[in-house]
Curated annotation (Swiss-Prot):
Protein name: UPF0259 membrane protein Spro_2675
Stretches that traverse the bilayer: 23-43, 87-107, 132-152, 156-176, 192-212, 222-242
Subcellular location: Cell inner membrane
InterPro entries with a match to the protein in the record: UPF0259
Cellular component terms (Gene Ontology): plasma membrane
Matching NCBIfam families: PRK02868.1
Presence of keyword Transmembrane: yes
Keywords: Cell inner membrane, Cell membrane, Membrane, Transmembrane, Transmembrane helix
Organism whose genome encodes this protein: Serratia proteamaculans (strain 568)
Keyword Transcription regulation tagged: no
Family membership noted in the UniProt record: Belongs to the UPF0259 family.
Membrane topology designation: Multi-pass membrane protein
Predominant localisation class: membrane
């Protein structure tokens, strides 16, 4: 029986609806951890003032590319910008690892008939987190490089690597073995993976647009809300990819 996108969408939404409470708690918890880590590792207010003091200069160079703007910064400004970027990247990576590990564990255990909370899902995924951390770091780095050089290679790599976390968590395969198998399966089943990935990307952009217009929220609260909603979208994609991989294995 051929695998159809409609069947996968229906199964994914049913699982998402039935486990909404646990998934929502997992999305909020990992969002809070991400924002907390970002706050902890970001430069302090005095250092950030170094960047804000030259805000007028940045506005005047709006027509320039990012590389030209960075080259015009002083060494102090470049160092502060590097710290801000590193804090944001590290916190997002840790949050994504916890979300992916916890979500895949939740899906697997619920599929086996067990009831599990968000905290227990993260705890049960602990043995897999180091491997997932390395996997997501490599995949994120390659995708970002592809997007920076030219958008299309980054999108293609995102699609190719989409099944790698599921393979790693489910079959306990190594990082590179998971990436290799993911590329093979993703391209062979592009007709059901590409639409889901495009919907995921569109939903993420929609969430970003919506939250950016909620001016009543403080920056920290807005960050938690944005990250939590983004995590919910990613959780739904993980359910879809997990279900797809289970069908491909059978």
């Amino acid at each position: 029986m051929p695998i159809t996108a409609n069947t996968l969408y229906r199964d994914s939404f049913n699982f998402f609806r039935n486990q909404l409470t646990s998934i929502l708690m997992l999305a909020l918890l990992t969002a809070f951890i991400s924002v907390l880590l970002n706050q902890a590792f970001s430069p302090d207010v005095e250092q950030l003032k170094i960047l804000s003091a030259t805000e007028g200069d940045f506005a005047a160079s709006a027509g320039m590319g990012i590389q030209e703007i960075i080259q015009q910064m002083t060494p102090e400004q470049q160092m502060v910008l590097l710290k801000v970027s590193a804090a944001a990247t590290f916190s997002a990576l840790v949050g994504n690892v916890l979300l992916v590990g916890g979500m895949l564990t939740l899906i697997r255990l619920v599929s086996q008939g067990q009831r599990i909370s968000a905290l227990r899902a993260i705890g049960a995924s602990a043995p897999e987190l180091p491997r997932l951390l390395l996997l997501l770091f490599i995949c994120t780095l390659l995708i970002q490089l592809g997007l920076t050089l030219f958008v299309v290679p980054g999108v293609i790599m995102a699609i190719a690597f989409s099944l790698a976390p599921v393979i790693t968590a489910t079959d306990k395969k190594g990082v590179f073995a998971s990436i290799k198998l993911s590329c093979k399966l993703a391209f062979a089943n592009a007709r059901v993976i590409v639409p889901a990935m495009m919907l995921w990307l569109a939903a993420k952009l929609l969430v970003l647009f919506m939250v950016s217009h909620l001016s009543v929220l403080t920056p920290n609260v807005a960050s938690v809300v944005l990250t939590a909603l983004s995590n919910l979208v990613s959780a739904l994609l993980l359910i879809y990819l997990f279900r797809l991989y289970m069908l491909l294995r059978s």
